[in-house]
Amino acid sequence: MKKLPIGIQTFSELIEDQHYYVDKTPLIAELAATGKYYFLARPRRFGKSLLISTLKSAFSGEQALFDGLYLQDHWDWLVRYPVIHISFGRGIVTSDVVLGQRFRAMLDEVAESYAIVLLQQDLANRFAELIQRLHQTNQQKVVVLVDEYDKPILDNIENPELAIAIREGLRNIYSVIKDSDPHIKFAFLTGVSKFSKVSLFSGLNNLRDISLNPRYASLCGYTDKEIKAVFNGHLDGVDFSLLAEWYNGYNFLGEKVYNPFDVLLYLDQRLFKNYWFETGSPSFLIKRVRERQYLIPDFENMVIDEVMLSSFDVEEIALENLLFQTGYLTIDRVEELGGERFYYLTYPNREVKASLNSYLLRDLTHSSASVVTSHQMQLYKALSQADFARLEQSLVLLFAAIPNDWYRKNQLANYEGYYASIIYSCFAALGLKVIAEDATNQGRIDLTVLLDNKVFIIEFKVLDGAKKQG
């Protein structure tokens, strides 16, 4: 039986060490045959690095690795292209100077592997020199692959001045790709975020963005069909409805996909856990929610237009865009009005909804994880037993536990939405189905909570502190 490729990001290692591989090479063949410059944005831990590594092996002519895969009979293995593989995934870039040092080291590593000595000292010129020399010495055009193209910026997103300086350095680097067009066979850039072309790719305006192209929706991630076809040796006893509820649901305008990191760890451990969520901290996102005073129930009703979808930048980061790009929200549906497309966002699955709301709840209440969990357990027990006296008492205790200073600092504390956000996050973090602003023929319900075969309707009212009853 083959091994689960947990944490494997190198295609050659995956194949040679007998790991499972979900064959994405039909899409790779199509990309190579129909275009030249590509960009793909996907959330972290979604298989982007493995995709880049697979492209590198294909263009390098490593035919033996593709035995039994689609590409074996749909690729010209007689031609080997020189490949420049750049990855900013290792370590943190702490300044524009470090960015230059890191990039120079990667260029020199590639040059050394092809026995080339670079003479240019300026980084952009050195990059251009490497591309030209590789073309000349190998008599084949060059393939440029850039992984985690945006990580140096995202690592410093809370320091706008530094992030902008790093962005300018990257723009100078990426502009070389367009200027080197006569020497380039294929270029592919991946990252988490989609920075606007004006800010980062002004010199590379021929980049084809396939992030929301339905044809390539499953280029990264696993479809339900792929899981059942490839991992059949590890599927005994798997409840596919629960697997989908927990880890499926990412919609890039094609077939919905699972997060591969979640699937592999679940198949290994057979426990439904927040595997993907625990690999990163949403601290910057939580900070933005707090600063902008967003209401948490509104997260499932966010609407974003195409302009906002492509306007992610250091100076202007819309929360809707941030939630989508980082994988905490996904596309629920698309609506066209007056020739414009509008994207309705929602949580992709139970893991993300429960985990994110758990973080949000701790921030909303300014309480520790243990305190919040204790209150959640009491509320859950009260709901499951339909014990309304206990439910009321549990709610009173939950709000009483919030520090007074936190109330005074929070501008939303005088509004119903603040309390609705706390209760929404409390139940959503438990994995319950919670519907905010549920529309009925009698009006709108503030909050609807579904548990087993019970439906709980909750309304919120904030009374004037001077009034004793209302």
Where on the chain are the PLM-derived regions?
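Phosphate-binding site recognition
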Residues: 1-415, 430, 452
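Structural signature of nuclease core domains in nucleic-acid processing machines
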Residues: 388-470
